[in-house]
């Protein structure tokens, strides 16, 4: 399909309007300009407001999960109002609308969670009964697993908002994705980087995913030079794991795949929301089999945890 935006010579990128989302869209534009020798005016960035951005007073798990950050943008993509959409992959549901796919992943930034502490530099050093802000069920469960004494409070809003709340003394610390902070030039606020062994990240964390229309070969050809092989393999594994567990913002699921040559290694974890129970798996296999490795890891954990473990999941 050749859209109007290509006919008039402008490539249109859809994105959320937050500073972080725009930084990711600008990074995508920069790479496209470099790959094809395009001038800046050949690529238009179109910020869009999503339900996830507008509803800031409740946890995502209460209001519908990950699709809240993508629905309006994906509709614009389906309608041909934009040519591609730039996303934080960790915010992407595993089931996409008919006719759309994640065609390219840019090289992944550091996938770890970053701790920003006000009264201590590390989670484990916070005083007894301290408060930590997080809106992620995964982070909440991991915090409670490591520090059952800590009070976890819902912490919505963009990065600047959360950092302001922290500075104002609303909480003693918070976790944010290291990649997002670095993309915003805020890496210096990080007081500790979470150990992915004990505090594994969300599947897809740190990776920019580009969504296009299936069959739009012109756009996919333009994007092909931006694709990063190892990131694509890792995310195939992580997203298959997430899909097999029916993962969304409503469920505490962690997973990280790393690629070394032709081998993919995967560490996955599922937790009860209160952190009282967790099950994990470490496995590896051929990179060509990445998605199957993720699926098998999920099936293993589902069997290991037993049906009662999932009763609280929606």
UniProtKB/Swiss-Prot annotation:
Gene Ontology BP terms: protoporphyrinogen IX biosynthetic process
Pfam families assigned: Porphobil_deam, Porphobil_deamC
EC number: 2.5.1.61
The organism's place on the tree of life at top rank: Bacteria
Record SUPFAM superfamilies: Periplasmic binding protein-like II (SSF53850), Porphobilinogen deaminase (hydroxymethylbilane synthase), C-terminal domain (SSF54782)
S-(dipyrrolylmethanemethyl)cysteine sites (modified residues): 249
Single GO cellular component term: cytoplasm
Recorded catalytic activity of this chain's protein: 4 porphobilinogen + H2O = hydroxymethylbilane + 4 NH4(+)
InterPro entries: HemC (IPR000860), Porphobilin_deaminase_cofac_BS (IPR022419), Porphobilin_deaminase_N (IPR022417), Porphobilinogen_deaminase_C (IPR022418), Porphobilinogen_deaminase_C_sf (IPR036803)
Textual note on the cofactor: Binds 1 dipyrromethane group covalently.
Cofactor(s) needed: dipyrromethane
Molecular function in Gene Ontology: hydroxymethylbilane synthase activity
Spans through the membrane: none
Annotated metabolic or biological route of this protein: Porphyrin-containing compound metabolism; protoporphyrin-IX biosynthesis; coproporphyrinogen-III from 5-aminolevulinate: step 2/4
Family stated for the protein in its record: Belongs to the HMBS family.
Subunit note: Monomer.
NCBIfam families assigned to the protein according to its UniProt record, in alphabetical order: hemC
Function in brief: Tetrapolymerization of the monopyrrole PBG into the hydroxymethylbilane pre-uroporphyrinogen in several discrete steps.
Name used for this protein in its record: Porphobilinogen deaminase
Gene giving rise to this polypeptide: hemC
């Amino acid at each position: 399909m050749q859209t109007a935006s290509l006919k008039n010579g402008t490539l249109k990128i859809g994105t959320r309007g937050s500073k972080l989302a725009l930084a990711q869209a600008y990074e995508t534009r920069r790479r496209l300009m470099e790959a094809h020798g395009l001038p800046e005016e050949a690529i238009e960035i179109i910020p869009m407001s999503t339900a996830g951005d507008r509803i800031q007073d409740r946890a995502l798990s209460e209001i519908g999960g990950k699709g809240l950050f993508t629905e309006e943008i994906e509709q614009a993509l389906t309608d041909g109002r934009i040519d591609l959409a730039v996303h934080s992959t960790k915010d992407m549901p595993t089931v996409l609308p008919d006719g759309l796919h994640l065609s390219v992943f840019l090289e992944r930034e550091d996938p770890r969670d970053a701790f920003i502490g006000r009264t201590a530099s590390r989670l484990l050093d916070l005083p007894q009964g301290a408060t930590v802000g997080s809106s992620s069920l995964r982070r909440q469960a991991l915090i409670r697993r490591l520090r059952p004494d800590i009070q976890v409070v819902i912490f919505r809003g963009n990065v600047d908002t959360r950092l302001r709340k922290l500075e104002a003394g609303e909480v003693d610390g918070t976790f944010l994705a290291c990649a997002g902070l670095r993309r915003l030039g805020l890496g210096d606020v990080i007081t500790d980087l979470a150990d992915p062994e004990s505090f594994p990240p969300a599947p897809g964390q740190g990776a920019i995913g580009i969504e296009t229309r299936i069959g739009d070969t012109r756009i996919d050809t333009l994007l092909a030079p931006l694709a990063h092989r190892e990131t694509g393999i890792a995310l195939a594994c992580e997203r298959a794991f997430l899909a097999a567990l029916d993962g969304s913002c409503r469920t505490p699921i962690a997973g990280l795949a790393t690629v070394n040559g032709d081998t993919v290694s995967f560490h996955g974890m599922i937790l009860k929301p209160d952190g009282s129970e967790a099950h994990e798996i470490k496995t590896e296999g051929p990179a060509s089999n990445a998605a199957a490795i993720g699926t098998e890891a999920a099936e293993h954990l589902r069997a290991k945890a037993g049906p009662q473990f999932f009763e609280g999941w929606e």
